């Protein structure tokens, strides 16, 4: 009877010793071990990655919270304004600070401390080793001079263009159909330009904008190509090839000033102005944060000064608004304005590394295509609606001529 009970129990769930040995032998076969090993490894790798991501996220968010809510307000303001410079990170400060606090920090950054100096005194103080010498343009290539610059927190690039009539606004489309903007490599082909920098502002929610339309009034070759009536800083050239930087600008005023080419950027980006024999530097009275920057200026002799700085890297954190003004002063600009920055900051110069004897092996993939600055975004250079382009020296269809014909 006991034996019968044992047999019954075995069939109801108990495994005999012989059966256990068979099962163990099956599990120890090479194929079974391989399947178990691969599954275990994949699971552990996945678990480790999730854990690492969570740890890094918590650490970063905690550090950001402490920094933004700590006792050091200058550091807080710098971090907030640096994040606000790029559309892709504008939402970050709102995670840790009240909206009115963020708005107040941004508003404070627009407070201007003007420095007024006579034009003669300014010209004497701003001359550097190159400017003002008779042979400055002796070794110029394409009627331009490319130079590297650096500051305490940034590396940058200066492109001097001797003839201001060659500088014009290139547009990605006629802005009537909402087409995506163009990358800088495409705009120079479309406009047959030898050089270019990014231009004005455009809608960029969350850093995902397509660059389809500009923001603020925009002129190209003597014609108003966009006018949404938004009040912005205006940066452009009149038909006498003089740089005009002012805010705000409307179509009626632009036409009365004979504007031929120009774009708009956020309010508060007038850098240097000159009138009545004086030059005024519009320094920021408070912290403006560091970022990639693009700006355009002009000397009294008409020379146009393009500036682009690198940013968001260990070797170049970025430049402040005041840094950009100081560079402009060094190069003798009597008028200057800031253009769109962050991941939009771009400078192109056709075959510059060949013309200036730069080792091509030191360049990244975009620089080998003609990009002068180092692009730090995670994608290809952005699609943008407007650019300041430089016509080729030998072209007869100059920007000034195009403006006169319009």
Enumerate the predicted regions with their spans.
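A short, polar/proline- and glycine-enriched secondary-structure boundary/capping micro-motif
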Residues: 178-182, 254-260, 315-322
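Conserved, well-ordered active-site substructure
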Residues: 208-229, 280-334, 344-406
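Short, solvent-exposed aromatic-acidic interface loops
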Residues: 173-177, 250-253, 309-313
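Short acidic-glycine loop/turn motifs at beta-strand connectors
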Residues: 161-165, 236-242, 274-276, 298-303, ...
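Active-site-adjacent helix-turn-beta-strand microarchitecture at beta-sheet edges
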Residues: 202-285
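Zymogen propeptides
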Residues: 3-4, 8, 12-227
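Structural recognition of the beta-strand scaffold that forms the well-ordered cores
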Residues: 194-198, 234-236, 244, 295-297, ...
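Extracytoplasmic
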Residues: 154-156, 190-192, 230-232, 291-293, ...
